[in-house]
From Swiss-Prot:
Its EC number is 2.7.1.211. Residues 107-461 form the PTS EIIC type-1 domain. The active site is at C26 (phosphocysteine intermediate). Induction: Induced by sucrose. Expression is regulated by the antiterminator SacT. It is a multi-pass membrane protein. It catalyses: N(pros)-phospho-L-histidyl-[protein](out) + sucrose = sucrose 6(G)-phosphate(in) + L-histidyl-[protein]. GO terms for molecular function: kinase activity; protein-N(PI)-phosphohistidine-sucrose phosphotransferase system transporter activity; protein-phosphocysteine-trehalose phosphotransferase system transporter activity. It comes from Bacillus subtilis (strain 168). It is an enzyme of class 2 (transferase). This is PTS system sucrose-specific EIIBC component. Its main location: membrane. The chain crosses the membrane at residues 112-132, 148-168, 178-198, 208-228, 248-268, 289-309, 329-349, 359-379, 387-407, 430-450. Residues 4-87 form the PTS EIIB type-1 domain.
Length: 461
């Protein structure tokens, strides 16, 4: 594949360089913010060598190339389109300008939590390894290696406010190191750590007529999000009114001291209550709606993926882990993803065209590994009926994992990789997860076969 020629041809089909505002890429997709999407030749873009699908979502025109390939295409594309790498930082802002307030809020949460996923995944996998070591008695509990693994596995969750502080500061346009400081203040060693001391009673201090609990915010999400948002406003306002000559001295000082007081007096307790309220509400629905909740969430999750809003769920999942120590939403999302793979596999066996088969098989296996965009946009949504079949499979699998109370100890992994973060909750939890995967994939496969596909009738552009 000639990446340079592909990039040149792609630019032509997109309406020329002048129609491209900014470009970036994720693990599988080239993400573009366009001036006028009506100038794009959608049909020809999808026929381009290496393209597995193209669609418009979340204020961006997204072209699926797949893992590895997208990096090489992007390098050639950015050169041919005269897009400087420095402009990539502004890509998210350019995309968000085209969204409505609700979508913009979801996009903001996504931008904050997606960069943190590797840290959470690493901790979750380490917890899985730790759980297996304890379950099978591979090491003595007094082993130095076991104690180190325990520290490694809990670090990301204990210091989560610092990670969020850095990421949220970047998203809100403030200094990420000040964000890290605010996150650090909220988990200071002088504060009682609720992560490991859930039953302990914190001391109180009296300040400005308020009783402030000396309780840390380790593992919390909403308190630090709100605190860093306020910090960004304080920093920007201070920078506007402070003379440039003393900006470096005054702005950080005012920002940290004002945000710190506000965080402990108001934002922290409010954020903790809000986060606990969300957890209680979700747990109530989970406990009382039972498998019906799994049926609905599992069936509709793929529709949510189409909007890009699904990344904002990471904030809720992180809150669940902090509050109750487990994530019962992720297994439901995983069923929806696996079902997309099952439907995509059915398309591979039903398809007559070589290009369809060429796209469907790797895209289906990608979904089994947790990356669904190629199979959703490149295969199932293109022929519509397989997408509906996947929704059916996701609903059935989701109902099963809720009925059997399957949970995970992290977020960000679905499909086969999620086995590692489901295992720590015991053999039964793991077996039910595998059964749920089988139900989702097989039912989606069968439903897609029953519905059939017409390769000459693709989704409407």
């Amino acid at each position: 594949m000639d990446y340079k020629e592909t990039a040149k041809r792609l630019i032509e089909l997109l309406g020329g360089k002048e129609n491209i505002i900014s470009a970036a890429h994720c693990a599988t997709r080239l993400r573009l913010v366009m001036k006028d999407e009506s100038k794009i030749d959608q049909a020809q873009v999808e026929e381009l060598d290496g393209v597995k699908g193209a669609f418009s979502s979340s204020g961006q025109y997204q072209i699926i190339f797949g893992t590895g390939l997208v990096n090489k295409v992007f390098d050639a594309f950015s050169k041919e389109a005269d897009i400087e790498r420095e402009e990539h930082v502004n890509h998210q802002d350019a995309a968000k300008e085209k969204l409505n307030p609700a979508a913009r809020f979801a996009k903001t949460l996504s931008n904050i939590f997606v960069p943190i996923i590797p840290a959470i995944v690493a901790s979750g996998l380490l917890m899985g390894l730790l759980g297996m070591i304890n379950a099978f008695h591979w090491m003595s509990k007094d082993s130095a290696l076991l104690q180190l693994l325990d520290m490694f596995s809990s670090a990301a969750f204990i210091f989560l406010p610092i990670l969020i502080g850095v990421s949220a500061s970047k998203e809100f346009g403030s200094n990420p190191y000040l964000g890290a400081v605010i996150g650090g203040i909220m988990i200071h060693p002088n504060l009682l750590n609720p992560w490991g001391l859930a039953e302990a009673t914190p001391d109180y201090m009296h300040l400005f007529g308020f009783d402030i609990a000396l309780l840390g915010y380790q593992g919390t999400v909403i308190p630090v999000l709100l605190a860093v948002y306020v910090m960004s406003k304080v920093e920007k306002w201070t920078r506007k009114v402070v003379p440039h000559a003393v900006d470096l001295l005054v702005t950080p000082f005012v920002t940290v001291i004002v945000t710190g007081f506000v965080a402990f007096i108001a934002i922290g307790p409010l954020g903790r209550a809000l986060g606990s309220g969300i957890t209680v509400a979700l747990t109530y629905v989970y406990d009382h709606a039972g498998f019906v909740a799994g049926l609905i969430f599992g069936g509709t999750y793929s529709l949510i993926v189409l909007t890009g809003v699904h990344h904002s769920f990471h904030a809720i999942e992180a809150g669940l882990i902090a509050d109750i120590g487990k994530n019962y939403l992720l297994p439901i999302w995983s069923m929806a993803n696996v079902a997309q793979g099952g439907a995509g596999l059915a398309v591979f066996f039903m398809a007559k065209k070589a290009k369809t088969k060429e796209i469907a098989l790797p895209a289906a296996f990608s979904a089994f590994l947790g990356i669904t965009e190629p199979v959703i946009f490149g295969v199932n949504l293109r022929y519509r009926k397989p997408f509906i079949a996947a929704m059916i499979g996701g609903a059935l699998g989701g109902a099963y994992v809720v009925f059997t109370h399957v949970a995970a100890n992290a977020y960000g992994l679905t499909g086969i990789p999620m086995i590692a973060i489901a295992a720590p909750f015991g053999f039964s939890n793991l077996i039910h997860y595998l059964i749920g995967m089988a139900i989702a994939a097989v039912s989606a496969f069968i439903a897609a076969f029953v519905m059939k596909i017409n390769e000459d009738e693709e989704r409407k552009k």
